[in-house]
Amino acid sequence: MNYFPLSQQQQDWQQLAADIASRELGQRAQETDRTGTYPKDSLDALRREGLWGLRVSKEHGGLGADMLTTCLIVEELSKKCPSTAMCYKMHLEAAEIICRIPTTYQIEHFVEPMAKGEVFSTIAG
């Protein structure tokens, strides 16, 4: 049940995430969790599908997705592989922080490469 009316674009993103999760993440999830390994192959699948720059603004080559769309995508991924969804969400959070008020250096070395899928970002607590 959705409490927010979803645009067609949001529904399309949600379906794409569900398809990727079923096709790519589900088959690796049990092994990733059993061995406690980093879900590199699953994250690479998200990168190949163009989701790496989800929270990077369109101005800097990203998708410029809003928070609701982001939540829909992460929710679908987590249904098949919570580990991948968590790592991906950490990347998105760091990307959003860097993209808020980036310097020219950050745009060139982090933001634009993130949008292209060349850089993985994360945060530490």
Please provide the spans of the model-predicted regions.
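Short, flexible segments with low predicted structural confidence
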Residues: 16-19, 49
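Intrinsic disorder at enzyme termini
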Residues: 1-9
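N-terminal accessory segments
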Residues: 9-13, 17
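Glycine-rich flavin
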Residues: 38-48, 52-125
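Short, contiguous strand/loop micro-motifs
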Residues: 4, 28-30, 97
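A generic secondary-structure micro-motif detector
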Residues: 31-33, 63
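N-terminal capping segment at the start of a domain
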Residues: 20-30
